[in-house]
From Swiss-Prot:
This is ATP-dependent (S)-NAD(P)H-hydrate dehydratase. Signal peptide: none annotated. (6S)-NADPHX binds at G114, N167, A168, M169, E170, F171, R172, R173, D229. Its EC number is 4.2.1.93. Keywords: ATP-binding, Lyase, NAD, NADP, Nucleotide-binding, Phosphoprotein.
Amino acid sequence: MSAIKEIPVNLPKLLTLFKTIVPKLTNDKYKGQYGRIGVIGGSLEYTGAPFFAAISSMKVGADLSHVFCQANAAPVIKSYSPDLIVHPVLDCLDAVDKIQPWLERLHVIVIGPGLGREPLILQTVTNVLKLCTKLQKPIVIDADGLFILNDNIDLVSGQRNIILTPNAMEFRRLFGEDVNDVRQKMSCLGDGVVVLEKGVNDKIHIPHTNEVYSMPTGGSGRRCGGQGDLLSGSLATFFYWSLQSNQPNPAYIAACASSYLVKRANSTAFKKFGRSLLASDMINEISAVFRSDFEDAETG
């Protein structure tokens, strides 16, 4: 088995590449063509996470974002924003049947934000994940969605267009700490799964080549809750655009783009708020960062 190769990204080249995947705004498009995103998550205790993911996908540029949550979380999530479409179905006995018609219309599915760990909910979402892979939907898996994979990594092994977004602890739970264990478990994922490991320097793992691309540090020392949800939501939109632009490595490009955007939003907001910085402050910076670094002057 070949050694893991850690490679610093070429940031100037990436910034040029990012602009090639961003679709130009034109009058001949209809609602939904710039992205329809689904977020599977949201429980009584965790209503902020699915909101952050869903609204971030739209702030980046998706047209529509749906949240599929537990019934007791729905009124709270609805109250956060009228821009989101909220489905209170996750704790229904026929949840998968209710979700399936929507899945067929969505471009990318985010699984995990605010999901919680109730056994019945986790089993339902496991079945939703199986359905997503059957429908060949691009998937981003984060937070408690990754918890499902701890003992069931085969759910994604060999599948196409899947991005996992673990933090350092979630990464160790999934792949272990010993470098040989990491390589062995990574190799089982196949060539259709990319891992975005979140940290001071986000790292994008390409499992089938043993390559690890290291992003610049960026961000700030402020680590408030919700930043990972901003990442998963923005990643979903970038993933759809990257796939639509027929880039040879769409998951890698999307992972780099979302990592860069969130770090820049954190850095920009930190200059204003310092230690008081919250994830909601970062959301308000997405537009300025996007215009500055992701769009050509004529994109509009």
